C-alpha cells in the first residue's frame, strides 16, 4: 500500500502546518518533460483509491497541467470565500488547485523568482483544503526558487523524484535528490 510507506515518514521540521493537511508530498524533477505531472496525478489517485483524502496543488506556474489532466473544464474558476480563500476544485475524488485556475487562459507567466515563490505559497496557504491525509504538490522542473522556498517554509513529509533513463535527465534527477537531502526532506522514491 502506498499510504503505509509514506505514513512511516514524519516531518521533523518546526514549521507551521498547512491548515487541513496532514502530509505534504512534493513530486519533483530536475528537468521538464519526464512525466512529473502524470506521476503526481497517478500518486494522488492511488492514495485516493486506498481510501485517503487527497489534494493536489499544481505549483508548476509556468506550465500548469493538472487541471487538464483531471478534466477540469478550461476557464472554470474556484469559488472564493471572504475575498481571500480559494475553495479547491473537485475532480475524480481529489481536491485540486492550480495557478491555471486563477489566471486568465493562455496568458504566459512572466514573473521572476520571488514573485513565483510568493504566488505558490499564497496558493498553498489560501486554499481551504478539507482535512487532507495527503497533499501532492506537482513542482515545476528544476532546483530553483520555488523548490527552496517550499523546503524552507512548508513542512514537506517527503519527495518523489521523476526522471527518464537519458544521461542528462538522470544527472538532473540526482541534483534534485541532493537538493532535498540538503534541506532534510526524505526522498521517498525515484520514478523512471
Q: What positions do the PLM features span?
A:
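Phosphate-binding loop that captures ATP/GTP phosphates
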Residues: 47, 53-106, 111, 117, ...
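Residue-level signature of catalytic and energy-coupling elements of molecular machines
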Residues: 21, 32, 58, 66, ...
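Walker A/P-loop phosphate-binding motif and the immediately C-terminal alpha-helix
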Residues: 23-60, 177
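Amphipathic alpha-helical transducer elements in NTP-driven molecular machines
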Residues: 18, 63, 113, 117-121, ...
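Short glycine/serine/threonine-rich phosphate/pyrophosphate-binding segments
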Residues: 33-42, 64-67, 139-147, 169-172
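Phosphate-binding/switch loop-helix module in NTP-utilizing enzymes
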Residues: 100-150
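Extreme N-terminal, non-catalytic leader segments
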Residues: 1-28
Amino acid at each position: 500500500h502506498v499510504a503505509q510507506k509514506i505514513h512511516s515518514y514524519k516531518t521533523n521540521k518546526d514549521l507551521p502546518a498547512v491548515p487541513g493537511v496532514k502530509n505534504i508530498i512534493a513530486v519533483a524533477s530536475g528537468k521538464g518533460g519526464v512525466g512529473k505531472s502524470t506521476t503526481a496525478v497517478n500518486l494522488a489517485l492511488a492514495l485516493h483509491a486506498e481510501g485517503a483524502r487527497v489534494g493536489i496543488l499544481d505549483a508548476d506556474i509556468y506550465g500548469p497541467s493538472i487541471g487538464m489532466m483531471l478534466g477540469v473544464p478550461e476557464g472554470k474558476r474556484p469559488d472564493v470565500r471572504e475575498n481571500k480563500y480559494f475553495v479547491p476544485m473537485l475532480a475524480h475524488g481529489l481536491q485540486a488547485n492550480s495557478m491555471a485556475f486563477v489566471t486568465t487562459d493562455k496568458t504566459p507567466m512572466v514573473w521572476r523568482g520571488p514573485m513565483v515563490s510568493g504566488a505558490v505559497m499564497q496558493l498553498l496557504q489560501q486554499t481551504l483544503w478539507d482535512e487532507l491525509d495527503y497533499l501532492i504538490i506537482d513542482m515545476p522542473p528544476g532546483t530553483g526558487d520555488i523548490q527552496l522556498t517550499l523546503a524552507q517554509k512548508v513542512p514537506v513529509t517527503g519527495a518523489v523524484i521523476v526522471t527518464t533513463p537519458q544521461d542528462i535527465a538522470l544527472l538532473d534527477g540526482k541534483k534534485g535528490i541532493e537538493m532535498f537531502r540538503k534541506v532534510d526532506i526524505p526522498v521517498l522514491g525515484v520514478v523512471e
